[in-house]
From Swiss-Prot:
Region (Insertion): 105-146
Identification of the protein by name: Yolk ferritin
Pfam families per the UniProt record, alphabetical: Ferritin
GO molecular function, one term: ferrous iron binding
Length: 239
């Protein structure tokens, strides 16, 4: 009994300690801002997880689109780099970082909910089903995907990607607004020049890819053409 109580107190003490700010560094850096940045780290890592899953899907022998696989592998790495940049930034400001689990199904469902919201600006994607994500996840996302031949092509994946990038961008814009409300000039500057600039560029590039794919006739040959062109994600801005 005493050992259990000691362990419980030790865990609670550890959690409390982990949430301490670094007083010698922290200045004009609020708890609510730190919490938002922690949440954004989770969202960046969730996006990375989705992209890694998509990369593995396009590497399958019955899909075999190496160019698109490479696109998603690089996109996954880019999102992880963004998460690391946020971690570095929190530490630079004297903040603290706690981590939560990442569930692929939950991550995909969050994007789906964003797409169907009034603020997404993606009315044409209201029937987004994230079928590839559901195919590679351990838990079923929905039962409305039908035959795999209907959604296994690259166009669907890039439409999913546009939704994900716009979701991440919306979260960054929300953090920027709250940072501005708190008069945190340093954070608003970092968000504008190192994160939002990159997101806008990525969204534009993905939109071009979708337009190009839609202009092709449906078929794996045209997906292969896009794969050979290889639409590389926008290079990471140095943080």
């Amino acid at each position: 009994m005493n050992s259990v109580l000691f362990l419980t107190l030790a865990v609670c003490s550890s959690l409390a300690y982990g949430k301490e700010f670094v007083a010698t560094v922290r200045q004009n850096y609020k708890e609510n801002i730190n919490q938002l940045l922690e949440q954004q780290i989770q969202k960046e890592l969730a996006a990375s997880y989705i992209y890694q899953a998509y990369a593995s899907y396009f590497q399958r022998a019955d899909v075999s689109l190496p160019g698109i696989k490479k696109f998603f592998s690089d996109a996954s790495s880019e999102e992880r780099d963004d998460a690391q940049s946020l971690i570095d930034y929190i530490n630079q400001r004297g903040g603290h970082v706690q981590y939560d689990k990442i569930d692929l199904k939950d991550a995909c469902e969050t994007v789906m909910k964003f797409v169907t919201s009034d603020t997404s600006g993606l009315e044409e994607f209201r029937d987004r089903r994230m079928c590839i994500c559901g195919f590679v996840a351990t838990k079923t996302i929905n039962d409305n995907c039908g035959e795999r031949s209907d959604w296994k092509e690259g166009l669907i994946a890039f439409e999913d990607t546009l939704a994900i990038e716009r979701y991440v961008n919306a979260q960054l814009l929300d953090i920027h607004k709250k940072a501005d409300d708190e008069k945190d000039a340093h954070l608003t500057h970092i968000l504008e020049h190192e994160f939002l600039e990159e997101q806008v560029s990525s969204i534009n590039k993905i939109a071009h890819a979708i337009t190009r794919l839609r202009s092709f006739e449906q078929g794996s040959g045209n997906n292969y053409k896009l794969g050979r062109v290889y639409l590389r994600p926008t290079p990471q801005i140095s943080h």
